[in-house]
Amino acid sequence: GPGINERRYTDTPISFSDLLPTISDIAGNKILKRKDLDGGSFKKLLFNKSDKVFRKTKGLIFHVPYENKIALERAHSAIIVDNYKLIKFYDNNDTNLYDLKNDISESIDLSKIYINEKLTKKLEKILDNYLEEVKAPKWQPGITWKENPLKIINSFH
């Protein structure tokens, strides 16, 4: 589009939740000031004014509170901050930490290495606090979340 450099590349992660704030920002609306939006505008990223997306939460957070055939086949939540991605599985409470800059395939779990234990705990705390703040649905064995409304299940962080 106009004002966007041709063939521009960035490794700054964005997510679907960033689209509404970005479109709104480009259109000149003030929706960005709403506190109930998870995403942030990447308008400045598009127009080479910044290499970051500013969100109310630190990093990108993903939450899959049910078993499925697509997302790792296990209930989990994940957070990406800077180069690191932490995944927390709910069926056995495993936590994995990956350095996305040096291990894009997420094949080397760094969470159990002594030097990374502090970072693992820090990211897990940020993730847990966010899930609690938004009252995210909580996984329970045998629940698919597709057959019953969340109000009936009544299981939240």
Model-derived regions, located:
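C-terminal cap/loop subdomain of S1 sulfatases and analogous C-terminal strand-loop tails that border
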Residues: 3-8, 12, 17-100, 151-155
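Long, internal low-complexity/basic segments
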Residues: 19, 93, 107-157
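Intrinsically disordered, low-complexity polar regions and short flexible loop motifs
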Residues: 103
